[in-house]
Curated annotation (Swiss-Prot):
Recorded GO MF terms: structural constituent of ribosome
PROSITE patterns, per the entry: RIBOSOMAL_L19
Protein name per Swiss-Prot or TrEMBL: Large ribosomal subunit protein bL19
Keywords: Ribonucleoprotein, Ribosomal protein
Gene expressing this chain: rplS
Length: 128
């Protein structure tokens, strides 16, 4: 491992020391809590939607979340190790066969739905 990779790994450890990032994949419905600064006030804003892309690039890792707000599709890109991310919660696992779900941009209504991954629930039941 070269020096730059080593520094990146140390920085990732420092940034994730006080928070846990759950494993998630494209197709999952997530709730991302973001720290928003408005003037001198700081508050947490929840952003819930479907992960349509995930980019794993070490410290530069990011993911795109898409939601429908007032009938209009809204996408937001989040940096995975950003200090502005308060937390990420996986609400529902999606069963998809693609790594990038950009085709959801052209779809609306029932055709934009994603099937739920059932094997995720079976493992929880088997563990109990």
């Amino acid at each position: 491992m070269n020096l730059i990779e080593q520094i990146e790994q140390e920085e990732i450890k420092r940034l994730t020391a006080n928070k846990t990032i759950p494993p998630f994949a494209p197709g999952d419905t997530v709730i991302v809590n973001v720290n928003v600064v408005e003037g001198n006030r700081k508050r947490v804003q929840a952003y819930e939607g479907v992960v349509i892309a995930k980019r794993n690039r070490g410290l530069n890792s990011s993911f795109i979340v898409r939601k429908i707000s007032s009938g209009e599709g809204v996408e937001r890109t989040f940096q995975l190790y950003s200090p502005l991310l308060a937390s990420i919660e996986v609400k529902r696992r999606g069963d998809v066969r693609r790594a990038k779900l950009y085709y959801l941009r052209e779809r609306s209504g029932k055709s934009a739905r994603i099937k739920e991954k059932l094997s995720f629930k079976r493992k929880e039941v088997a563990a109990q």
